[in-house]
Amino acid sequence: MMLSRAKPAVGRGVQPTDKKKKKGRKIPKLEELLSKRDFTGAITLLEFKRHVGEEEEDTNLWIGYCAFHLGDYKRALEEYENATKEENCNSEVWVNLACTYFFLGMYKQAEAAGFKASKSRLQNRLLFHLAHKFNDEKKLMSFHQNLQDVTEDQLSLASIHYMRSHYQEAIDIYKRILLDNREYLALNVYVALCYYKLDYYDVSQEVLAVYLQQIPDSTIALNLKACNHFRLYNGRAAEAELKSLMDNASSSFEFAKELIRHNLVVFRGGEGALQVLPPLVDVIPEARLNLVIYYLRQDDVQEAYNLIKDLEPTTPQEYILKGVVNAALGQEMGSRDHMKIAQQFFQLVGGSASECDTIPGRQCMASCFFLLKQFDDVLIYLNSFKSYFYNDDIFNFNYAQAKAATGNTSEGEEAFLLIQSEKMKNDYIYLSWLARCYIMNKKPRLAWELYLKMETSGESFSLLQLIANDCYKMGQFYYSAKAFDVLERLDPNPEYWEGKRGACVGIFQMIVAGREPKETLREVLHLLRSTGNTQVEYMIRIMKKWAKENRVPI
């Protein structure tokens, strides 16, 4: 939800005016326009005077100042650069130039210009923010110590807290300033944004309402309101909130259009992602992350990895996403290195003081222990927020696996059956774990039916092996024999005949003991006859003899 800092918010063209309306109207003074924050009018006046030869002192600096406040940073840059080339250039020009470089994302140039300026609170604030951009903790602390207890410096400190994910610290500063300056309405938006980042979406809405009562058409506030609706309700509700913005966003607010296009992709579940997000990757920070998420949802793990591999994570969200991508790539490639990186990222977030008691933090710890195959620990964390994810397919998928892995196949089966996603239900991991749960819960027929619904493939062959072996271990010899029979026909491996022979003997013993219907013997004989092994005739002869003695029709 950051603004575009690389594109001018206002073009250079002066809007044509009606000369008749202007006739007789007094030309306003520059001071009047600046006091009203009419920067467009001020630039128009300054350019007019420049054109007719009535240029005032420092005209280029005033044009640069107005362009900067309109978001036309390229125009401001041009004016300030020209000013620095003049003789006896005021040293304050350098700090203004540095601020312009900063908003254009040209941080090295901003630092160089900043050090040419005379020492001032503005210079210190600028260098403070640049130290954050460069991840230079030593310089950051040095400039931090120079901050004073004045509004501008405290707002700068709050901004750094926000960017370092220290949202509560930022809120404390904003609230303290608001106590003495109720007229600083925009601070309510900053407070609301911090609460949004802390996942307190309802509180964010309440704080935001204070600002929207006074400024109902604010682009940033309406966008944040839409984001809150997305989190509290759904994408449709969020999109409805953005409608007025889409209708009213003027050409002078290009960043608003970029922001709206980006958020609509998110609200619509990724629709149009490949058309909208790539050009915004270096404009809106979240665009890269959301494009990575899109690729993951499309199972294009390699593209997701290519997009995020060079990103140096600084926020919990970035650490989490890098962890997810590395885990997915590790599973796809069978790479232990990627799995270890993922586990470390998850542990870093889940173990941090700021995230350990949040749901994302606990999800990270669950993921960390999942990768370490410590499923008892996985369940401790999953159970701590289970009530929030009752109908969430991904949660139920992980919860079911953890339950089954710890031997609680009854609850594992129950969780697997809650899953609604057809894509997930056709995944081999889902099918194999559910089959195992069915077998352990003495429902081998349901496991066999899972196999029958599958098309012939390597995965169906693997499921057959699982059914054959697990049913054998559980004494469910009938379905074990059926599975080994199919395996033997698909691959004449002696091991499959041995498994089938043992399963058939097991069924026969259960029939003799009265624990299996006598009618099953007919099918056992049919399974044995499909094998060309020399041992078959001896086994069939014994079974037939018993059937004859016990009057069992075969």
UniProtKB/Swiss-Prot annotation:
- Region annotation Disordered: where it falls in the sequence: 1-26
Name where it's found. Answer: Cell projection, Cilium
RNA-binding is among the record's keywords: no
Tell me the ranges holding the TPR repeats: 57-90, 92-125, 151-184, 468-501
Q: Which UniProt keywords apply?
A: Cell projection, Cilium, Protein transport, Repeat, TPR repeat, Transport
Main location per UniProt?
other
Regarding protein family, the annotation reads: Belongs to the IFT56 family.
Report the protein name in the record.
Answer: Intraflagellar transport protein 56
Natural source organism? Macaca fascicularis (Crab-eating macaque)
Gene transcribed to yield this protein = IFT56
